[in-house]
Design a protein with these regions (language model features):
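Accessory recognition modules or surfaces
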Residues: 1-18, 47-57
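Active-site-adjacent pocket-lining segments in enzyme domains
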Residues: 5-31, 35-37, 74-214
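N-terminal beta-loop-helix "entrance" segment that forms/cooperates
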Residues: 39-65
Length: 214
């Protein structure tokens, strides 16, 4: 069975992995007869946000510990990812991708990528293995690989992707961008004002495309 490494960035749309996107990703991977293993950096999030009030909280939360909520405890530190053990890499969105896995939320096109995340992306790419990124996470792949990705219809994000050396493809909620040369698949998800069922259509299409090219 083909195996997919999934990188989480916490638990929650405002400061970690977007829970709908992460859960639907695992469902889509599983429905395609693929196996997954979740990973996350064993580091504190840059912020903790109260998802009810939207206020920033004065506390620390660990990405690995928080990601374990989504993974039902079956999660490993990101430095244990070995591209030779997996067939593809998958990164759900959520502001944790833009705050914790990289500094895009704070620095825009001048962002830095967490070294462990950059190493993982480069190792899969070097091995010729696909990378899937959802929502805001494609900015990371654009920065690291200069890939053609989608930010939905967000012109501001698109311009920053291009400033970082990537290319942007405008997509609706039920569409994906596929960079055949770099083997990168991306879907806009909640970069659009979409319902959970609409987000599912894009994620399922990304998973279907992944299975097709594996």
């Amino acid at each position: 069975m083909k195996k997919i490494a999934v990188i989480l960035s916490g638990c929650g749309s405002r400061d970690g992995s977007e829970i709908h996107e992460a859960t639907l990703s695992l469902l889509a991977i599983d429905m395609n007869g693929l196996e997954y293993q979740c990973f996350a950096p064993n580091k504190n999030q840059t912020e903790v946000v109260n998802h009810f009030t939207q206020a920033q909280e004065q506390e620390n939360r660990n990405m690995l510990v928080e990601g374990a909520r989504i993974a039902r405890g079956n999660i490993k530190p990101i430095d244990e990812i070995n591209a030779s053990d997996f067939d593809a890499l998958w990164i759900p969105g959520g502001l944790g991708a833009a705050k914790n896995l990289c500094s895009y939320f704070y620095d825009g096109a001048n962002m830095k990528v967490l070294p462990e995340v950059e190493t993982a992306i480069k190792s899969f790419h070097k091995a010729g293995k696909p990378v899937v990124a959802l929502c805001i996470a494609p900015v990371i792949v654009a920065k690291v690989l200069g890939a053609n990705v989608t930010s939905g219809k967000d012109a501001g994000t698109a311009s920053k992707i291009e400033a970082m050396g990537g290319k942007n493809t405008v997509c609706n909620y039920d569409e994906i961008a596929y960079d055949a040369e770099k083997r990168v698949i991306s879907a806009p998800c909640y970069m659009l004002d979409a319902s959970i069922s609409q987000v599912w259509l894009g994620i399922k299409k990304a998973a279907d495309k992944l299975k097709e090219i594996l």
